């Protein structure tokens, strides 16, 4: 990362250095480029003219929906925001210039724990903290020249928005996709609330508080996302080439579909069999014991019928397991623990009695919470068997590359998990893996003891939270059960926070708001209590992109006619941190709404761009490291345009940026050079460019053509590099070519202003004005490219004397070595550098380089 970006900064520095002389001369005439003055000059004009308003009645332009992931209002904008909004803005402005009616809205993901925790810490109302931060961020976005349609703003904490969260909940409830159940949940002991599986980090800690997550049994609300597991997985194929491969891979792995069989094991002393899911039913003959998750209901039931000493040992062990994170439990490095339950299962293929153990390395929510242990061919089972002296039976003959049998796992301690031929397996002996699996499933099905099955890593989405600052769940509870609040009684408003103790205590603060909680049932008026939990804020963001098409509609969540025109989102921009959470949930909700008839599409985002992180000195910015760079400080030092241009030029957008390696001052110098071009043009607007210098026109049109290609491919840094080349060529044409009055110079500078408006809108707007045009350059339109000028008639040849550049010659791409040698030696600048000295050697690399070494 560092080397590549440093190279790009060197390129910018070299570009500026080459023009140091002319720049200084131009600054001495009293008309200098002042980035801050331009910000003050043009922002009020844009506020008045609203060039980014979208969806005007009668607008027949083709539509393009560009969306940045909306921010959480946790303070002012930081450098990560600066990068994301700069890149998203390039895309939105580009398509606007290309003649599209671009909807580029913004809003705030305004509910959530940070506001509530800040309110507790500071003694503030969460509303005040949230909306004060929104006002601050909004002002910064305006200053940063984000091309948002400010008439479409939404806040998820507004009742006008979260009313439709509740409507969405009711729609899922009606379809059987929202339900309530008792289950073991991830519990954050610091924030005192539950977490979805996706909100637990790989190290077993909460993504929000950093606390070690534990298991707790609670009654919670879920969305049945597993009903859509196959579609969510299979439809990823349609996103190939449009979404980053990394995101697609992460979602595939998270959904985690596997194929295998469900096998029924009879349990001695129990009427109902236990169903076990396995991907290797061919190895059933190698099962020597059964393991059930220690925190599962099944383990508790089996232990209840055991002797007192077994039951007591199990209860103590169960408590220990519930205090251990899933990540720790699944660690291959962790010592295996467990307790026998004194019960036996019967292997359906050979009738053997298998002792049943409760252990922590099996999770209650994987499959049925019970596994058949085949220790010879599964390392975790083998580790457990060796720890407790359980038998190990080889049923797959696995060989090394030389055809030699691998060591016995019971002796080597290493399970043989590769493919091989089945042995010690009755009728399956001699079969390979796939044939063995197929035969095992066939036999189990015929015997009524099993069936083919799929399993998923994905679990239903836990959406209830025990906190205040969120969307109230629109359900009341009566003595006869749960009752959904009718749609005509929405929204269920949050009560004021005054008088409520918001400090985390394991139950929702709303439960203490007696006047709010106690209500009559909407069915029969009998006493009822509102559900005291609030929704996961990822519900808010799972459909917000739909609301933007009609954000002020108080009759429906979104206008179905408008969403059919605008949707799905053509271009989505945001960080890869949301690959599993937000993006998966948004895909799920979109498919549900499609199935309910509200949407004509079932994928929310056609294209996705993940920008990298902004770091400092090789590590993420954080308060604890003391390396945070404030955006406001950078804007005060360098100006908006320089920061935006730096973000685009720093490197490929998906790469991380190390702010220590980039050069906003270099960007500012380049902007001054570009701006002075517009000041120097002397021809009038409307002059016929075809009468101008052909070489410069060729550079201009090649730049427009290539910038289009690079922007559409997200190669923003390369697009900026091409723009720099055009600025250099234009300066050369003014100073030592056809001059400032040449029509080709005006064409080049106008093209520069239009392209620059994608990256540095203030400077571009002023250039457009200096060129004699009315505001706004954002709507100027992309200049038409003359295809005939894309054929490069000349190339620039660099002529060096003793390694120093002395001249640049425009020559034919087909020029011969001899002709180029003579042309270079005839140059007056070269002759002056030689000073009459003889030549030692002349190296010619036609058509781009001549290096002359004098004697």
UniProtKB/Swiss-Prot annotation:
CDD domains: Anticodon_Ia_Leu_BEm, LeuRS_core. The keyword ATP-binding applies. A motif ('KMSKS' region) lies at residues 620-624. GO terms for biological process: leucyl-tRNA aminoacylation. It is found in: Cytoplasm. Residues 1-11 have a biased composition (Basic and acidic residues). Its main location: cytoplasm. ATP binds at residue 623. The keyword RNA-binding does not apply. It catalyses: tRNA(Leu) + L-leucine + ATP = L-leucyl-tRNA(Leu) + AMP + diphosphate. A motif ('HIGH' region) lies at residues 71-81. GO terms for cellular component: cytosol. Keywords: Aminoacyl-tRNA synthetase, ATP-binding, Cytoplasm, Ligase, Nucleotide-binding, Protein biosynthesis. SUPFAM superfamilies: Anticodon-binding domain of a subclass of class I aminoacyl-tRNA synthetases, Nucleotidylyl transferase, ValRS/IleRS/LeuRS editing domain. Residues 1-31 are annotated as: Disordered. PANTHER family: LEUCINE--TRNA LIGASE, MITOCHONDRIAL, LEUCYL-TRNA SYNTHETASE. This is Leucine--tRNA ligase. It comes from Kineococcus radiotolerans (strain ATCC BAA-149 / DSM 14245 / SRS30216). The lineage of its organism: Bacteria, Bacillati, Actinomycetota, Actinomycetes, Kineosporiales.
